[in-house]
Amino acid sequence: MIASLRGKLLQLEIDRLVVEVSGVGYEVMIPFPLHLECKDKLNTEIYIHTFHSITDRGQRLFGFGSKKDRESFELIKSLHGIGELTALKILSFFQADDLYQIAKADDKKTLEKIPKVKGKTSEKILFEIKQNLKKFEMFLNEGTTESSFVDRETDLATLALIQLGFDEKSATKQVADAKKLNPGLSASDIVKQVITGTR
């Protein structure tokens, strides 16, 4: 099993990267936070933790910036009805400690900031997290607070716009402009303002 990779970053996209190790290029699926970490590291050496998936449909590598993120991914994908790609999508928006706080507060609205996670889908995910709350509690840090995920509103809004069809440069600028005018905006409010053209 491939648990980690160290090598030159050859290619970087929103949801994947290619890292060259000893002359071999490995394509790795990644969450959005790792994409942000790697933005300025093309053609330089990187180190990532990986989860090596082997199924009847083939093999895939998933990459993470920390061991904790990889363990969060493994926990999320172990929930009933949640596959690897859905788990990666969730991890692009929220870490395991965020999900713990969301479930404790029964905050379906926050969970629905993830594109296409609405209605019965968000209810099912929330239910599964609640059923495994003790496991998610293990990811809490001493500094974790009820509003810890609020600090990532900018990243949430940027990713949401990209998934709506904006290119990354435009999405980043639009979000920065909106936050400059009103620093207290939530991710969903930023996205609404950008789409409607209001400020």
Swiss-Prot record:
Alphabetically ordered keywords of this record: Cytoplasm, DNA damage, DNA recombination, DNA repair, DNA-binding
NCBIfam families in the record: ruvA
CDD domains hit by this protein: UBA_RuvA_C (cd14332)
Function: The RuvA-RuvB-RuvC complex processes Holliday junction (HJ) DNA during genetic recombination and DNA repair, while the RuvA-RuvB complex plays an important role in the rescue of blocked DNA replication forks via replication fork reversal (RFR). RuvA specifically binds to HJ cruciform DNA, conferring on it an open structure. The RuvB hexamer acts as an ATP-dependent pump, pulling dsDNA into and through the RuvAB complex. HJ branch migration allows RuvC to scan DNA until it finds its consensus sequence, where it cleaves and resolves the cruciform DNA.
Domain III, as annotated region: 155-199
GO MF annotations, alphabetized: ATP binding; four-way junction DNA binding; four-way junction helicase activity
Organism: Leptospira biflexa serovar Patoc (strain Patoc 1 / ATCC 23582 / Paris)
Swiss-Prot/TrEMBL domain comment: Has three domains with a flexible linker between the domains II and III and assumes an 'L' shape. Domain III is highly mobile and contacts RuvB.
Gene designation per UniProt: ruvA
Record-linked InterPro entries: DNA_helicase_Holl-junc_RuvA_I, NA-bd_OB-fold, RuvA, RuvA_2-like, RuvA_C, RuvA_C_sf
Subcellular localization, as worded in the UniProt entry: Cytoplasm
Quaternary structure and interacting proteins, as annotated: Homotetramer. Forms an RuvA(8)-RuvB(12)-Holliday junction (HJ) complex. HJ DNA is sandwiched between 2 RuvA tetramers; dsDNA enters through RuvA and exits via RuvB. An RuvB hexamer assembles on each DNA strand where it exits the tetramer. Each RuvB hexamer is contacted by two RuvA subunits (via domain III) on 2 adjacent RuvB subunits; this complex drives branch migration. In the full resolvosome a probable DNA-RuvA(4)-RuvB(12)-RuvC(2) complex forms which resolves the HJ.
Main location group: cytoplasm
Protein name as annotated: Holliday junction branch migration complex subunit RuvA
Region (Domain II): 66-144
Biological process, per Gene Ontology: DNA recombination; DNA repair
